[in-house]
């Protein structure tokens, strides 16, 4: 028979678990990265979260370099010299289409959006209700993003000039997240785009960091 460990933890603490002296320190890390730039740096692409910590502290790092992985910016790079084994394989990235918004979700979204003020910084979760909320924010001004996740709907509001990130205390003029989840439209938009930055989860989801933004609004 086999055994597994169950380790309850907050998401922002997972980076520590994969750290050098963490309970989940790895013998080997297998990951997918972007093609390296002229300086040899590969981006973690869609997900920085605990990936950076796990990669930096694993005994062996095995990376698939994939030209379809977006080169996201922020604190989410690994140098090619720090990769032990490289596999070159170009595979399109799986897409996650937005959920269907029904009438109930639409009503909830409309109500929640009415509570958002100009200049607020938003955290948005996964599911139909956050998508519905985004649909009702088109009349707002200078919203900011400091969120675990960035989705297609956030890109739409950036393009409309609703999300500017100008009013944020922390990381102004940048939409901050720890991973991307959406369609090719999102991945293409985030590619080498300084308006979006991915950072490790122990930064993005840390309550002490989040609290440095005034008028923080969480919608899940």
Residue ranges and their predicted role:
Residues 1-220:
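Conserved alpha/beta enzyme-core scaffold
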């Amino acid at each position: 028979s086999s055994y597994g460990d169950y380790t309850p933890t907050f998401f922002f603490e997972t980076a520590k678990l994969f750290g050098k002296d963490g309970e989940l320190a790895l013998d080997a890390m297998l990951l997918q990265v972007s093609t390296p730039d002229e300086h040899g740096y590969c981006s973690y692409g869609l997900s920085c979260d605990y990936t950076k910590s796990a990669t930096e502290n694993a005994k062996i790092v095995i990376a698939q370099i994939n030209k379809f992985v977006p080169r996201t910016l922020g604190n989410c790079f690994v140098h090619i010299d720090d990769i032990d084994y490289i596999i070159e394989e170009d595979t399109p990235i799986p897409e996650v289409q937005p959920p269907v918004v029904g009438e109930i979700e639409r009503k909830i979204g409309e109500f929640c959006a009415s509570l958002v003020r100009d200049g607020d910084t938003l955290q948005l979760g996964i599911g139909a209700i956050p998508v519905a909320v985004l649909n009702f924010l088109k009349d707002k001004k200078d919203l900011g993003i400091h969120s675990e996740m960035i989705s297609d709907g956030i890109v739409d509001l950036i393009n409309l000039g609703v999300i500017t990130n100008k009013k944020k205390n922390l990381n102004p003029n940048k939409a901050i997240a720890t991973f991307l989840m959406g369609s090719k439209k999102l991945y293409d938009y985030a590619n080498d785009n300084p308006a979006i930055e991915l950072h490790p989860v122990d930064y993005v989801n840390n309550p002490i960091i989040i609290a440095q933004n005034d008028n923080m609004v969480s919608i899940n």
